[in-house]
UniProtKB/Swiss-Prot annotation:
Keyword Ribosomal protein: yes
Name of the protein in its database record: Small ribosomal subunit protein bS6
Record key words, sorted: Ribonucleoprotein, Ribosomal protein, RNA-binding, rRNA-binding
Domain of life of the native organism: Bacteria
Record lineage: Bacteria, Bacillati, Cyanobacteriota, Cyanophyceae, Oscillatoriophycideae
NCBIfam families given in the database record: S6
Keyword RNA-binding in record: yes
Family annotation (Gene3D superfamilies): 3.30.70.60
GO CC terms, sorted: cytoplasm; ribonucleoprotein complex; ribosome
Designated gene of the protein: rpsF
Gene Ontology terms: biological process: translation
Pfam families, alphabetized: Ribosomal_S6
Length: 115
């Protein structure tokens, strides 16, 4: 049975744009190779953290939505934990279909005059 998942991970802020793309594509490939489908990856950019993580005050946020049976999560999270690029990660099982990411969302209709 295929479930919807959302994974958010935070990369070190000192990574270059090429390194961010490399890490992002690495985890996307890992998920695809293990049977995940409908992958949507969005780099949210560098943001200030609410509290320091591993002595970093900023981090690069990446969000991944996908469908999978759940067996992929353990391998991906193990790689994130052992690697040095990811400073924090979280995977959540979604009850409903994920909301379209901003880049994939259709343009909103303008409000009707006088409404």
């Amino acid at each position: 049975m295929s479930n919807n998942y959302e994974m958010m991970y935070i990369l070190r802020p000192d990574l270059s744009e090429e390194q961010v793309q490399e890490v992002s594509s690495k985890y996307k490939t890992m998920l695809q190779d293990s049977g995940a489908s409908d992958l949507q990856v969005q780099v949210r950019g560098k943001r200030h953290l609410a509290y320091p993580i591993q002595n970093f005050n900023d981090g690069i946020y990446i969000q991944v939505n996908y469908k999978a049976d759940g067996s992929q999560i353990k391998a991906v999270e193990r790689d994130m934990r052992l690697g040095e690029m990811v400073i924090r990660y979280l995977t959540m099982k979604l009850d409903a279909e994920p909301i379209a990411l901003e880049a994939d969302a259709p343009p909103s209709e303008p409000a009707a005059p006088g409404a």
